[in-house]
A protein has these predicted regions:
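Conserved TIR/SEFIR loop-to-helix hotspot centered on a Trp-containing motif
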Residues: 68-86
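Structural motif corresponding to alpha-helix initiation and N-cap regions
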Residues: 46-49, 77, 112
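Short beta-alpha junction loops
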Residues: 69, 92-100
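C-terminal helix of von Willebrand factor
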Residues: 110-122
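Glycine-rich, charge-decorated loop segments at or immediately adjacent to ligand/cofactor-binding or catalytic sites
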Residues: 97-112
Length: 122
């Protein structure tokens, strides 16, 4: 397995459970990938953008959990915009029956091989 990579996870708060599933996959001993979640858990405030940008800069890449909720999540939109300026971004669809597209984000089906390929490319 490649060295452990630091990954920032951008997600709409409504998709927090999916973020938890992604983190759980990384802890699975049979998982072909592992990462450190750098997402900002604090509530949105005046220094939030500064903290997000700092964490994205310290990350090797960004995974965006894409769903219909992404379209109305101002926080996730800003995280993705910042990430596109700073790092490599991979979108993964958060749900099997939701194929929302975000402009400028390469989004793929949530599979271990797809995530492993992205992480190994960092």
């Amino acid at each position: 397995m490649a060295d452990k990579k630091v990954i920032f996870v951008a997600f709409a708060i409504e998709d927090e459970r999916q973020r938890d599933f992604l983190k759980g996959q990384s802890l699975n001993t049979d998982s072909p990938f592992e990462y450190i979640d750098m997402s900002v858990k604090e509530a949105y405030d005046s220094k939030w953008k500064e903290r997000v940008r700092t964490r994205i800069r310290r990350s090797d890449g960004v995974i965006a959990l894409v769903s219909k909720n992404s379209l109305t999540s101002s926080g996730q939109k800003w995280e993705i915009s910042c990430a596109k300026e700073e790092k490599k971004v991979l979108g993964i669809w958060a749900y099997k029956d939701d194929r929302t597209n975000l402009v400028g984000v390469n989004t793929v089906v949530w599979t271990w091989p797809a995530i492993e390929k992205f992480i190994n490319s960092l």
